[in-house]
Amino acid sequence: MKKVVCMVLAAVMLMACLAGCSSTPAPTPEDSASAAFKIGGTAPLTGGAAIYGNAVKNAAQIAVDEINAKGGVQFELRYEDDQNDPEKAVNAYNTLKDWGMQISLGSVTSKPCEVTSGDTFADRIFALTPSASSVATTEGKDNQFQMCFTDPNQGSASAQYIADKGLATKVKVAVIWKNDDVYSKGIYETFKAACDTLGIEIVSDTTFADGNDTDFSVQIADAQSKGAELVFLPVYCQPASLILAQAAAAGYEPEWFGVDGMDGILTMKGFDTALAEGVMLLTPFNADSTDERTAAFVKKYQDMYGEVPNQFAADAYDCVYAYAQALEAAGATPDMSAADLCTKMIEQFTSMTFDGLTGNGMTWNEQGQVTKSLKGMVIQNGAYVGLD
């Protein structure tokens, strides 16, 4: 009798369990589609390069909010601080991986990204960096892509632009660059090679490194004594701001020409923007553009963060929108694994055309390098103005 009772009770419990299970509906394709893709990146949110990291994070968040508001593809964004340090970048990346990151915005600056790109390659997480421009970032890694130009392209394009605009036809050129920075070195090397080909005379070629990046009196004196009338600065904002200030104090007033790393110098805390008057640079983004989409982005960024967005911000904004386009075209859903998404993103980015703030008709080759046009800019009255 006890056995019968036990059997009956067991049957009742089994039926209750089955009823409970059947009351919970199975996930539907619609449920998967309405969930969010986890997208993350590492950036210098503190420290000397924070101007770039925060610009990228802020603009990426604007893009995520806009895309999420439209329905369809949804994103959950997370950034971790790497302080522009490769070792800290690895720790930041691992935090994002543990969080469940499915697609990546890579790292903002080149040195950290050269390290984290190796991790995303090994883990088969697709990465699209807005601003890590060194060739080593993507070299030998089929799932690492760039929204920015590579360093070699910036160097040769700068020399060609200077020649085409007649900026160095009758003047001598100086270069001040950072010899322990892959970004600065990569641009310098192709700039110098292009100058040799184009017949541009470099009369002063001086360098600096970490730990020796606050006093530029020797470099400035060398350029000044050799009669350089145009100084090329393939460096970031922090050293550029000091060079401009110290040159002015020394009474040295050449023309200055920089690249995308100097975009943002006007928003540096404590920097006298009058020192940057007349500075020229190449960048894919013009915040002064009357283009409707650009103007709307600039206004929204200013309203939210109180400053004009730089090229790093625009590239990050484009990254998120490019991801949205690629994910939608691939029919991807957030329940897919990072590896499966990686395969689909490689297929999409090597075949699609993308229009964004930093260019129209953008395409990527199999090495992850983007094709788009650079724009000449000059700083006038504390604002960026297009030269072209």
Model-found features: residue ranges?
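Positively charged n-region of N-terminal signal peptides that target proteins for export
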Residues: 1-9
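Extracytosolic ligand-binding ectodomains
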Residues: 22-388
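C-terminal motif of bacterial Sec signal peptides marking the signal peptidase cleavage site
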Residues: 16-20
